[in-house]
Curated annotation (Swiss-Prot):
This is Uroporphyrinogen decarboxylase. It comes from Sphingopyxis alaskensis (strain DSM 13593 / LMG 18877 / RB2256). HAMAP family: URO_D. Keywords: Cytoplasm, Decarboxylase, Lyase, Porphyrin biosynthesis. Catalyzes the decarboxylation of four acetate groups of uroporphyrinogen-III to yield coproporphyrinogen-III. GO terms for biological process: protoporphyrinogen IX biosynthetic process from glutamate. Its EC number is 4.1.1.37.
Length: 342
């Protein structure tokens, strides 16, 4: 059988390459002039996410410009609560809003609308038909804990206090929210795979706000369930877990969830991660997004340190979180050249 030209996909399956594959979280976004032009023509962010032609174009823009090894689907983690029946909108300059906030049993009052995900599947099909053969196509979803923090509070927050309070005060009600998110997430990711993504990533952006016991209950257990069910349906599709802020709990996450690869945020020492994580587990990361903004010698040193930290482990170069809007395009070009040894 002919070997796949998709180096990033092969890395997720345990291969090592002379040149480290790379992509960047939020690589399709506001730092790109072509994205800003398209976003302005389409109006709101959510409208852009639900327009298959436009969302496919946004997904493809950084591939055309930079030739990344991976393309990440352009969408948002909050399409899941929208499909579960919450109202979702984005306030200019303030971020997402969801109504009603899921307190006092409000989950039971929601009327599910899974058809809201259909445009995302259409986007996946469009992108899959358009990508270069060497480019790995990555789908994604938010992990249950992170999605639940928005659903309970009705908005983003700095400390996730509303969800944390509910998890302590009424774990049965909070667990029902987690279960509803997990069930739809399996369906959603399976749909993405069926339409053509090569691998998927679970984003747990607020995993770092939990104690070890809560982390086990609300991060590890739900993600393990998603991975197990997804693998039963699609055993050959790699799953990347990204529990941002997990720190010393990363090893337990890696060992207990069953993910095929793990993403590191910028606070993790890559040398520590290489020593602490299960042998040969592929890792992804973990450049500080602000180092990419700064550029210069500091950027070069940070890139080199990460590349040197994984001498025998499969590694995908990425950021420790999403690229920020004021990142100079020239710095991204320099990053790619340095990672690829140009």
């Amino acid at each position: 059988m002919k070997a796949s030209p998709k180096k990033l996909l092969a890395t997720l399956r345990g291969a090592r390459h002379e040149r480290t594959p790379l992509w960047l979280m939020r690589q399709a976004g506001r730092y790109l002039p072509e994205y800003r032009a398209l976003r302005e023509s389409k109006g709101g962010f959510l409208e852009l996410c639900y327009d298959p032609e436009a969302a496919a174009e946004v997904t493809l823009q950084p591939i055309r410009r930079f030739g990344f090894d991976g393309a990440i689907l352009f969408s948002d983690i909050l399409v899941i609560p929208h499909a579960l029946g919450q109202h979702l909108w984005f306030e200019a300059g303030e971020g997402p809003r969801l109504a009603p906030p899921l307190v006092d049993g409000a989950l039971a009052s929601l009327e599910a609308a899974p058809q809201r995900l259909d445009p995302v599947y259409a986007t996946v099909a469009r992108v899959a038909a358009s990508l270069p053969p060497e480019t790995t196509f990555l789908g994604f979803a938010g992990s249950p804990w992170t999605v639940a923090t928005y659903m309970v509070a009705g908005r983003g927050s700095k400390d996730q206090a509303a969800a944390r309070r509910m998890a302590f005060a009424d774990p049965a009600a909070f667990g029902a929210i987690i279960d509803a998110i997990a069930d739809l997430t399996v369906t959603y990711l399976s749909g993405q795979i069926e339409q053509g993504v090569d691998a998927v990533q679970l984003f747990d952006s607020w995993a770092g706000s939990l104690s070890p016991a809560q982390f086990e209950q609300w991060v590890i257990a739900p993600n393990a369930g998603i991975v197990r069910r997804l693998k039963a349906l699609h055993p050959d599709t790699p799953v990347i877990g990204f529990p941002k802020g997990a720190g010393g709990k990363l090893r337990a996450y890696a060992e207990e969830t069953g993910v095929d690869a793990i993403g590191l945020d910028e606070t993790v020492d890559p040398t520590w991660a290489d020593a602490a994580l299960p042998s040969q587990l592929p890792v992804q990361g973990n450049l500080d997004p602000l180092a990419l903004v700064a550029g210069g010698a500091a950027l070069d040193a940070a890139i080199d340190r990460i590349l040197a930290a994984f001498p025998s482990r499969p590694h995908i170069f990425n950021l420790g979180h999403g690229i920020v809007p004021d990142t100079p395009v020239a710095h991204v070009e320099h990053l790619i050249k340095r990672v690829r040894g140009g």
